[in-house]
């Protein structure tokens, strides 16, 4: 089982990820794009990062809006360093 990150560590790490928040034991962020196509290009890029890192986000998409949630299933659905690694990778796509 993966080791979850403490609330203090989460707050420290979130300071380096503008727009990301923590609630309900998940990291979360919403993105707005110009149109649906741009949102889908972003989601496709996320899919490659998720596969590369072997860590997969929760994704919600409606037209030009994308919502990402991150939690680690094999850490009892808590936040781990894997979630922050994927969040940083997602941010690097913009």
What kind of feature is each model-predicted range?
Residues 44-45, 88:
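Solvent-exposed alpha-helix faces
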Residues 67-93:
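C-terminal structural segments of small proteins and small subunits
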Residues 54-60, 89-94:
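A short N-terminal helical cap/helix-turn-helix that marks the beginning
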């Amino acid at each position: 089982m993966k080791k979850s990150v403490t609330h203090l560590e989460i707050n420290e790490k979130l300071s380096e990820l503008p727009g990301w928040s923590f609630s309900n034991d998940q990291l979360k962020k919403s993105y707005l794009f110009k149109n649906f196509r741009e949102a889908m290009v972003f989601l496709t890029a996320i899919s490659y990062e998720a596969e590369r890192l072997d860590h997969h986000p929760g994704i919600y998409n409606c037209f030009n809006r994308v919502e990402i949630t991150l939690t680690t299933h094999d850490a009892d659905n808590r936040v781990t360093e894997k979630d922050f690694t994927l969040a940083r990778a997602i941010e690097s796509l913009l």
